[in-house]
């Protein structure tokens, strides 16, 4: 289908006030819950502060407002949660591009039924680890991180809002040049608008007097088209045609961010890519905690070949080449560059970098993009296993 584009705004005053950019995403979730189309909405709600996000399954539209708004300092991955706990439920979920790609890859493996999932994609410029965010706010913004009540990434800047309503901002380039800013995998991301979702939403392209009051929505599937049509018909949202200039600006923003991602990809996967000797030093730090395996959203085997000991009893440390080699042979074709494996590694091994590097080589050789292409990964021989 040819994707249709709209400016969309929530009709509910409470959602308008609390929601991001007109609250359209929250309004669509409310429609799905109120009409009984889904059993619940899987989303994040703020915990004690902006660095603390709590995954929550909302089953009543009255509780949706607690999930409204963005949390860039709390990276979370939905694919594994849906696969493990919500396989049989009908759900709606807001997805970053890497979330979307993981869900699509799991669907190819018969681990998620896409007929049961409404994906509302969120345009994404990247996320920041909570610890990094607190450190950089203290260092670069010279304020107490606990006094920050809101943050956002806009026009190449990381912006914070304080308790007193004041704003402070620093260019993302300046932060990242000093080892802070977005997660490294986000820096080299090559998917900014999640068009495999049913609807892709964001603020890019909303300009003039509409800025901040409407959400830009690109309808990507027939399911998404019907959802928006029905939600408007029943008075949950209002839509209007986007400003033509806004369409141009949105395309330029996406193009600019993709170019930036390619530059960072060259930096981290080529110029600063570890040598074999450096990798050997990194792998020798591995303690076989299984964190990288357990957090990977695309890993799904019920009986894992890595669970059994892969060294003789009493041998320490374990052979990291065997452990990571098996993982790479299983997953590198389908790495969605979510960075979760690197986030959880207690030894701070840059695991995601080698997986992304191998996936890039696969893509160049075979043309396969995990979570974007419709066919099964080449490693699966064109067929998807059921377990």
Swiss-Prot record:
Does Hydrolase show up as a keyword for this record? Answer: no
Locate the 4Fe-4S ferredoxin-type domain: which residues? 275-298, 326-355
Which parts of the sequence bind [4Fe-4S] cluster 1?
Answer: 286, 289, 292, 345
Q: Does the keyword Cell membrane apply?
A: no
Q: Record's superkingdom?
A: Archaea
Q: Which cofactor does it need?
A: [4Fe-4S] cluster; FAD; Zn(2+)
Q: Would you identify the family this protein belongs to, as annotated?
A: Belongs to the FrhB family.
Q: What else is known?
A: The genome of M.maripaludis harbors two sets of genes encoding the F420-dependent formate dehydrogenase (Fdh), fdhA1-fdhB1 (Fdh1 isozyme) and fdhA2-fdhB2 (Fdh2 isozyme). The Fdh1 isozyme is the primary Fdh and the Fdh2 isozyme may not play a major role.
Know the name of this protein? F420-dependent formate dehydrogenase 1 subunit beta
Organism of origin: Methanococcus maripaludis (strain DSM 14266 / JCM 13030 / NBRC 101832 / S2 / LL)
Gene name as annotated: fdhB1
